[in-house]
């Protein structure tokens, strides 16, 4: 399910180097932290008045010619913290600044050792449409959504973590603020602000216990290798607490506080909102401002997106790193899924394509498992990414989408199967020819995934599209196929989770202007049922055409 086994010898060396570096740092009395881990500086300071608004605290961390500025925060009881995620090994010097004399002018050094096993750093945008960890390791996004799991009873939260640990998912979408859904059965134990529920809040004073609990869960996801796509606002308050309609100053203060607390966690992604357009008290100018606050205050440049309801945000804006889309129809076939890539030239993540659930569930939660898996495959061969959740109500009234707990659907094992296929393939898949052969993605001349979807073919005549053509008046990217290349074909049953190699190899011969066939005209026999795919990999013969650009 992961590519880790291919790197085990290196992991052992990294672990040894990390342990040695930490030991040397301890011997010198200098604090040590691994690259991309979290260094925390704790300082005592003033507790009188309202430190959340009265005290400003920051620090600069310097490594050679580089300087990184980070904001600190008040954690209650006269305690202040500054958190830092170093992205380079070596000695980093720091110096604090504050309007409180007790916090200003603190200096020191932290030794940054090589990253620990499995730590590849934060996820970044890579090659325009895709993602990779900071060290270059490919990241094949496979996410699920569980909005309010951190606001449910402790036992249910622990069950959710166990479920995630055994799941194929490497990203979790979750909310900061509680939802109104199911609140009578499972009332939130903590709230983000000082005050008394339901609506007697002091928006100038945060509740540190709430945020410590949030951080604990974010850290546990990190330790499981799961990215946390943190939803900062949502419209599901249902008029209970008013967190969806705070005044502008409270919104801005909240964003700066949560970024100061959480930006040093390498697995954080910022989702500005879920169904942003359903929050009637906010304008597009508000969302633009929120993005800019997060972008400015996060020194590490974590991924930033915003999820839509009925209306799309302008994802072309520079502070949006990738598109987070709700659109189930877009992934009913690969040709539709690809279109958003051409609009924004950014990664496209269909975080909500409807959910697997019971037939009597609301229309957004009534997909069958085969249909949800089908949408994942359509999005995959289109060079995009797709998200999961489920809406089965159990006897206690808990659903994975809202509360977490256990997964009951049939899609997760099939998504684990898809993840294994992706991680055994090239780092990224792109459409081969999105104008004509929309059901095929891959790397031209090397690797292809052909997905038949609902069709039930009895055979497939070997045929690979040339790809996009050089053409007057401008040269477009074109494919890398030539005569004499040798390919192996595997038949994939995406539902039965089987891979069946086809005997022999297929040798390419150009057939017309736009495609290559097998030189002997061979075809692949298929079992005439839906949900089939083909994996086509180059195994020898002629080399791909040199100098060809893209797919």
Name each region found by the language model.
Residues 2-12:
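Bacterial N-terminal signal peptides that target proteins for export
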Residues 11-22:
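Bacterial N-terminal signal peptides
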Residues 28-65, 70-73, 109-115, 436-441:
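Non-catalytic, glycine-rich low-complexity segments
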Residues 29-32, 50-51, 137, 356-359, ...:
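Aromatic- and carboxylate-lined catalytic core of secreted/periplasmic carbohydrate-active enzymes
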Residues 68-128:
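Extended acidic/polar, glycine-enriched regions
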Residues 81-85, 476-478, 511-525:
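Exposed aromatic-hydrophobic patches
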Residues 120-333:
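Active-site mouth of glycoside hydrolases
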Residues 253, 274-413:
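Extracellular glycoside hydrolase catalytic/binding regions
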């Amino acid at each position: 399910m992961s590519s880790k086994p291919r790197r085990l010898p290196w992991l052992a060396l990294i672990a040894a180097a990390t342990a040695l570096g930490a030991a040397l740092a301890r011997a010198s009395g200098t604090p040590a932290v691994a690259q991309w881990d979290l260094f925390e500086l704790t300082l005592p300071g003033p507790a009188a008045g309202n430190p959340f608004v009265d005290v400003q605290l920051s620090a600069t961390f310097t490594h050679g010619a580089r300087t990184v500025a980070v904001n600190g925060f008040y954690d209650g009881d006269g305690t202040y913290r500054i958190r830092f995620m170093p992205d380079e090994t070596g000695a980093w010097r720091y110096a604090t600044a504050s309007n409180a004399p007790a916090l200003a002018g603190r200096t020191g050094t932290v030794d940054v050792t090589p990253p620990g096993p499995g730590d590849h750093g934060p996820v970044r945008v890579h090659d325009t449409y895709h993602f990779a960890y900071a060290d270059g390791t490919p990241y094949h996004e496979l996410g699920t959504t569980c909005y309010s799991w951190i606001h449910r009873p402790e036992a249910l939260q622990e069950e959710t973590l166990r479920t995630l640990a055994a799941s194929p998912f490497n990203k979790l979408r979750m909310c900061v603020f509680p939802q109104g859904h199911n609140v009578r059965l499972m009332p939130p134990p903590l709230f983000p602000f000082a005050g008394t529920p339901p609506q007697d809040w002091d928006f100038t004073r945060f509740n540190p216990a709430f945020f410590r609990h949030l951080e604990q869960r974010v850290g546990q996801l990190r330790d499981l290798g799961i990215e946390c796509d943190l939803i900062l606002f949502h419209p599901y308050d249902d008029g209970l607490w008013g967190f969806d309609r705070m005044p502008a100053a409270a919104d801005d203060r909240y964003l700066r506080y949560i970024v100061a607390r959480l930006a040093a966690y390498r697995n954080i992604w910022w989702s500005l909102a879920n169904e942003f357009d359903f929050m009637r008290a906010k304008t597009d100018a508000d969302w633009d401002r929120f993005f800019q606050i997060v972008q400015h205050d996060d020194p590490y440049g974590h991924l930033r997106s915003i999820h839509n309801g009925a209306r799309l945000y302008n994802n072309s804006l520079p502070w949006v790193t990738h598109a987070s889309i709700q659109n189930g129809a877009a992934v009913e076939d690969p040709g539709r899924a690809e279109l958003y890539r051409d609009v924004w030239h950014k990664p496209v993540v269909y975080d909500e394509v409807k959910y697997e659930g019971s037939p009597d569930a609301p229309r957004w939660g009534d997909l069958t498992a085969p249909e949800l898996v089908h949408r994942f495959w359509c999005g995959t061969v289109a060079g995009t990414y797709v998200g999961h959740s489920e809406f089965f109500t159990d006897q206690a009234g808990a659903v994975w989408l809202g509360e977490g707990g256990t997964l009951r659907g049939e899609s997760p094992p099939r998504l684990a199967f898809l993840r294994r296929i992706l991680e055994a393939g090239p780092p990224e898949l792109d459409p081969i020819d999105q104008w004509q052969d929309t059901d095929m993605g891959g790397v031209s001349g090397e690797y292809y995934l052909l997905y038949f979807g609902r069709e039930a073919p009895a055979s497939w005549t070997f045929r690979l599209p040339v790809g996009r053509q050089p053409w007057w008046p401008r040269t477009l990217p074109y494919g890398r196929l030539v005569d004499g290349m040798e390919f192996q074909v595997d038949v994939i049953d995406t539902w039965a989770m089987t891979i069946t190699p086809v005997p022999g190899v297929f040798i390419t011969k150009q057939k017309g202007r736009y495609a290559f066939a097998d030189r002997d005209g061979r075809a692949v026999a298929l079992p005439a049922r839906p949900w089939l795919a083909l994996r086509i990999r180059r195994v020898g013969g002629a080399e791909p055409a040199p100098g060809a650009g893209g797919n």
